Regions:
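Solvent-exposed loop/turn and edge beta-strand elements of beta-rich ligand-binding domains
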Residues: 2-363
Length: 363
């Protein structure tokens, strides 16, 4: 019994020492804060679909500030240090950070698409805990998604203003706190228009004319597009294909294809709408199921909009199939059967007469 009491006492003493050491360590750790003059906020710029993002600069502005703890008013909190290379027109907003991605900077792999905002902290005359609300400026580039949720930057000022400790909260409502976010993406894909000819009388060497137009689409509104987009024609295609680019929201483009050929237009932002038609000899659009000369035209995807995320095998494609079935002309065919039968009857009759005459002569 005495031995049990002894071990119990040793265990209790060990637990007290452990708790005391933990408390002492916590007290010591609380005094090792380092002053922060700036805060880094990491941004991932993702890619959806099959495209190349244009050069893009993202900006953060200070939208609000407030005192969480302290004896000063919200208006007395110093603003975050202003960005030196802010846009010429700020619309009265207080720009505090930017990050630039070059052409093709959007990547599907998060390890390759990271950039950072660097927010510089001001000097403080008062201790306290202050919260800054940061907002990403929504740009106007077609295909780019901008972050809508705000970012909370909390600065704790201690030791009579000598030390600034910052924490970044990029969470959505009820989400996890983080100094990194992946809300931004570039979404684009390639449009393909193809031609096919079928049927035993179909001529696969005949060229057919088409007309294509591109519009921004409801989802893109008045966003900015590239000056133009390159049309890739088939190798050794028609000499009539002389228009090499097309403008979203601009004039339509006409081109020629024969069976088995396609054109493609790459890097069209998601939501861009296309309309493409096959033209008859008079330059009029041929409807699905109608005829173009001797051909019946079947159309799949004459109208549509560019899909990036979740695109299927049939997305972003338009195909035209012209069918001509017929019976080959074999020339004039004479039916000799009646004549052959008549000759056979005459021959049989002649043989019968000859045999009958011989029989009479023998009698």
């Amino acid at each position: 019994m005495k031995l049990k009491k002894f071990f119990a006492g040793v265990l209790a003493a060990a637990m007290m020492l452990t708790v005391g050491a933990t408390a002492a360590f916590a007290t010591t750790a609380a005094t090792t804060y380092q002053d922060q003059s700036e805060v880094e906020i990491y941004k991932h710029y993702g890619l959806e679909g099959n495209g190349t993002s244009p050069e893009e600069t993202f900006y953060l502005v200070q939208a609000d500030k407030k005192v969480l703890t302290g004896d000063i008013k919200d208006s007395d909190i110093p603003d975050l240090t202003a960005l030196t290379n802010a846009p010429a027109s700020t619309d009265g907003r207080h720009y505090v950070a930017s990050v630039k991605f070059g052409e093709g900077g959007a990547k599907a792999n998060d390890a390759e698409n990271v950039g950072e905002f660097v927010v510089k902290l001001p000097t403080y005359d008062h201790v306290g805990k202050f919260e800054y609300t940061l907002q990403e400026v929504a740009g106007n580039t077609a295909g780019v998604t901008y972050r809508l949720d705000t970012i909370k930057l909390v600065v704790s000022v201690i030791n009579d203003g000598a030390i600034r400790v910052a924490g970044v909260h990029t969470e959505n409502e009820g989400g996890e706190k983080s100094s990194s976010f992946s809300d931004n993406k570039y979404a684009a894909n390639t449009l393909t228009v193809s031609k096919y000819v079928s049927g035993n009388m179909g001529d696969k060497k005949t060229y057919f004319q088409f007309e294509l137009s591109l519009e921004p689409g409801t989802a893109n509104g008045r966003k900015n597009f590239a000056e133009n987009y390159t049309i890739t024609y088939p190798t050794n295609g028609s000499d009539k294909n002389t228009t090499n680019t097309i403008v979203v929201g601009g004039a339509s483009v006409k081109f020629w294809l024969k069976s088995g050929e396609s054109i493609s237009i790459a890097n069209l932002p998601e939501g861009v709408e296309w309309t493409v038609s096959e033209l008859d000899a008079d330059g009029k659009a041929v409807a699905n199921g109608a005829t173009n000369g001797v051909y019946t035209v079947s159309v799949d995807g004459a109208n549509g909009s560019i899909v990036a995320a979740g695109a299927s095998e049939t997305s972003n494609k338009a195909s035209f199939t012209n069918t001509h079935e017929g019976t080959p002309d074999m020339g004039v065919i004479l039916d000799n059967a009646p004549y052959i039968a008549l000759l056979a009857i005459v021959a049989i009759g002649g043989v019968a007469l000859m045999l009958n005459k011989r029989r009479r002569d023998e009698e």
